[in-house]
């Protein structure tokens, strides 16, 4: 009985994987717009990606996507008679490997190299004597995510890892 269940599960997984092959392939283009999940403020995340290589690294079904990312996030920390205002603008390039596991679910992971145009500003007593902190610069990090397709061109995604937020979710348009 266990062998039969295992065989049925394997057939189901492989049949779903074969149906999932068109989720992301060479030439596929994605535009994603999302928001970050943070305690303060609402980060905005925008990205574009294009499938450039199928069977990446010799792995059947693995597709390399390259693209760009833009993120914006600002918030203020108010405390009595003073406040800090933080702003981050991230502009970068992404490389993601997509692998279809089940029908309608595009799973992926990869890296981003970006520049963080950041600022921190103090407003309050003794503002002239408070040193401005050093912020911003080049950043490198990893991303893992999944995109579920509602239709051939529209889906929802969730990403975790480096970006304007540790977790971002939103809509994805495929064309």
Region spans (language model):
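Transmembrane beta-strands of outer-membrane beta-barrel pores
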Residues: 35-41, 50, 70-76, 85-89, ...
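Residues on the lipid-exposed face of transmembrane beta-strands in outer-membrane beta-barrel proteins
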Residues: 35, 46-50, 93-97, 111-115, ...
